Amino acid sequence: MRGCLQLARWLSAAPTRPAASHWPGLCAAPRFFSHSAILRASARTARAAASKPPSDLESRIAAIPIERYRNFCIVAHVDHGKSTLSDRLLELTGTIEPGTNKQVLDKLDVERERGITVKAQTCTMIYNHNGEDYLLHLVDTPGHVDFRAEVSRSYASCGGALLLVDASQGVQAQTVANFYLAFAQGLELIPVINKVDLPSAEPERALEQMKQSFELDTENAVMVSAKSGLNVEKLLPTVVDKIPAPIGDCKKPLRMLLVDSWYDSYKGVICLVRVFDGEIRAGDQLVSFATGIKYYVGEVGIMYPNETPQTVIRAGQVGYIFFNPGMKRSKEAKIGDTYTKVGSEKAVEPLPGFEEPKAMVFVAAYPVDADHFEHLEDSINQLMLNDRSITVQKESSEALGAGFRLGFLGTLHCSVFEDRLRQEHGASIIITPPSVPVKVLWKDGREEIVTSPAKFPDEDELRSKVAEIKEPYVLATLTFPDEYLGKVIELCESNRGVQQSLEYFTSTQVILKYELPMAQLVDDFFGKLKGSTKGYASLDYEESAWQTSNIVKLQLLVNKAPVDAVARIVHYSQIERLGRKWVTKFKEHVDRQLFEVVIQAAVGRKVIARETVKPYRKDVLAKLHASDVSRRRKLLEKQKEGRKRLRAVGNVVIEHKAFQAFLSK
């Protein structure tokens, strides 16, 4: 009561009509804003943010002409020290504090866990050389063949590259592959020998290999130790002198290439861009050449090494932008797309973009809990924003429910994606073993690429309608010490390989080229190769051709009913080994039933291997007198008939966790 009286006195003392300047929402009629009004308000907010006084960093960047820009990347084989060298360069230019840094540009959890670079990461640095500031843009690229699409995209924003070689290991397979990729893009290459302070280092041998393999001028080569920082200070003057400045004009209409994108839970889709002409500020209205959709820029900035807002990004620079309002769908951010300002569409020629890599390894992914399907779909879409080389199709399985058919560039690519799903999105998934696509040539002239066992022709169609089936082959390049030559040749031959060439590029190092089926390559070929050579071999591969092959569908049957989640497309020579492995492993995870459970591996009507799970046996003779033989026989016959009837009508109950355990490695 006392509270009500106090409230009444407060209301009577308050003004009867609030001042319009203080309470616009109470005195005026409700206002409804149109979408265009919201966009204009967002643009005004962005322009207000852009009009703030520039920071010291911005002032230094603004004073640097495009002639003093240098865009470069570091390319090398896996584990030759790219990320560690990047750390030293960032410390040398004052971008990060020295001493406590370890792979600053490896930002993903999976990269730090595995010690490999998965995503190409960028960073802007300012370097003072001979009294003048230079704007350096560094890209740390992956070394593994599965992430070559990342490397080739990085080259589009660079004018040169540091070709890094480990002094103790020398030139290896992916060094060769990355060199030819950079050479084809016309990049200026600077040879760098790393890890020269190791006891096993042979820098002169590594230099000689680079000279013989690539015909590079090694007089300008720099000998460094990225770990200790030895001679790293000699690298940047070489970069400034040897790598050309980017070509661009700030006065021309904006022409900007989308190089990469990722998702931020607060800002939405963030785009990494390379500006070729013109300049871009917050508040500008842009249009995409690929989709025709228009956006207002919410913020622009550079990676220094993290997102650092700026007033403007000019021609020749690489930076990030995000839109306000953001993109409605993540698929709007198309890698390789060209953007310009609204009104300049006719004056600007779109850039050629990137060639999309083809997925060559396919797996099926299902949520462990069927209720988490939508969460898994959202997680996959967000990761695809950051990795456009993945292909996705929805599919369903009777055993595992709704899921996805995912396509990857290789087995490591698949494994890293699975780790990122679990770590970054908390998604629990079941992944089927990797398989490769096959090409079916029908007798009526049609060609069909089959990526899922469910779409593979059945036995009757194979006989009557299919002309031939082809599988993809790759040209694999293997480098290793010559003492392991016999073991490596034996491994390649046992995996249906055909030798193409054998050469020595030093007295002890061999380059061996084999044509191998892609299906054998994804079946842990690299692990077997490392085992045969005590870890000294390196592997690189490129697509070769489709070749006619004896391909069949291997199925797992439980009481003659096929289990669709386990079916695989394999070569005929593999069916016996794989079939026996399947039935033995699956038997371990199937619970005993009241009737006999028969597990078979079959190709069409032909059974390859079989295991039986014995039923529970009820003791029907427990209460019977030992001497009553006829009664004993009658009870056993009745039990036998009951089992037959149960086997005929009973369904085998296989727990979801049984599939999860079977499909896990």
Curated annotation (Swiss-Prot):
SUPFAM superfamilies: EF-G C-terminal domain-like, P-loop containing nucleoside triphosphate hydrolases, Translation proteins. One of its GO terms (biological process) is positive regulation of translation. Its EC number is 3.6.5.-. Residues 1-40 form a transit peptide. GTP binds at residues 76-83, 140-144, 194-197. GO terms for molecular function: GTP binding; GTPase activity; mitochondrial ribosome binding. It is found in: Mitochondrion inner membrane. It comes from the Eukaryota. Keywords: GTP-binding, Hydrolase, Membrane, Mitochondrion, Mitochondrion inner membrane, Nucleotide-binding, Protein biosynthesis, Transit peptide. GO terms for cellular component: mitochondrial inner membrane; mitochondrial matrix. It catalyses: GTP + H2O = GDP + phosphate + H(+). Gene3D superfamilies: 3.30.70.240, Elongation factor 4, C-terminal domain, Elongation Factor G (Translational Gtpase), domain 3, P-loop containing nucleotide triphosphate hydrolases, Translation factors. It is a peripheral membrane protein. Residues 67-247 form the tr-type G domain. It is an enzyme of class 3 (hydrolase). NCBIfam families: lepA, small_GTP. Belongs to the TRAFAC class translation factor GTPase superfamily. Classic translation factor GTPase family. LepA subfamily. Promotes mitochondrial protein synthesis. May act as a fidelity factor of the translation reaction, by catalyzing a one-codon backward translocation of tRNAs on improperly translocated ribosomes. Binds to mitochondrial ribosomes in a GTP-dependent manner. This is Translation factor guf1, mitochondrial. The gene is guf1.
